[in-house]
Amino acid sequence: MPVFYTPIPQNLRVGLANVSGSVFINNRTRDSADFKDHYLENEACAEVSSHLPLQMMLYFNMFFFPFWWISELLMLQLKFSYLPVYYQCLLVTGMVLISIFEVLRMYLGYAGNLKEKVPELAGFWLISFLFQLPILLFFITDPDIIILPLERAVHSLYLAFLLGELMASFLALRVMTRKLAQQFHMRQFGHVQGLHTAEALPMFGLPYGGRSVLPVQDI
């Protein structure tokens, strides 16, 4: 299993984890009867929560992006002289930003999904929604940038990848945050149950002094 070293600072990871917990967990008060089947609870906590459809889309997106980048670069070179100066600056800036964010996005997506790390996967979702999606929508919807047929085709396919990854990562985050919350509740419940058991043992067995309170008869 590869080891992923996250570039996210620790304070930002904590913030992303808190935001993910507040957004993706259904904060309902749980009754104590919810924990009556401990075997099923432990089995659910041990279940792998990595999202296979998300991993497949990340895999194919990683191979598709170089083709998208080369196509966009060639189309930009063809139409560059026909564009106003401000559109030239916008398109070049958009290409640079989308390339940088794509590398970071793929890394966070792989690390978050394979290693089941909520902050990394939340960072992947936020970058996809706040940066990649607006830039790509600008590339595909503004008619003044002279959208060529090849551009429209590769942008549409890239947009399909992006929307699918957004939905899949949202579902994966819900599963991971619920699993973490379930593990937390199980640890708390197990700790309280252990304390109650330890307090009850001296009443029926050996007290703290090591002497039995029950009468012992010679055989």
UniProtKB/Swiss-Prot annotation:
Q: Which residues form a coiled coil?
A: none
Task: Give the CC-aspect GO terms.
Answer: ciliary membrane; ciliary transition zone; MKS complex
Q: Which GO terms describe its biological process?
A: cilium assembly; non-motile cilium assembly; smoothened signaling pathway
Extract the InterPro entries matched here: Uncharacterised_TM-17 (IPR019184)
Where, subcellularly, is it found?
Answer: Cell projection, Cilium membrane
Q: Glycosylated residues: list them.
A: N18, N27
Where are the membrane-spanning stretches?
56-76, 83-103, 121-141, 153-173
Swiss-Prot/TrEMBL keywords: Cell membrane, Cell projection, Cilium, Cilium biogenesis/degradation, Glycoprotein, Membrane, Transmembrane, Transmembrane helix
Q: What family name appears in the similarity comment?
A: Belongs to the TMEM17 family.
- What functional role does this protein have? Transmembrane component of the tectonic-like complex, a complex localized at the transition zone of primary cilia and acting as a barrier that prevents diffusion of transmembrane proteins between the cilia and plasma membranes. Required for ciliogenesis and sonic hedgehog/SHH signaling.
Q: Do you know which PANTHER family this protein is assigned to?
A: GEO07735P1-RELATED-RELATED (PTHR13531), TRANSMEMBRANE PROTEIN 17B (PTHR13531:SF4)
Q: How does it assemble?
A: Part of the tectonic-like complex (also named B9 complex).
Protein's UniProt name? Transmembrane protein 17A
Q: Which gene encodes it?
A: tmem17a
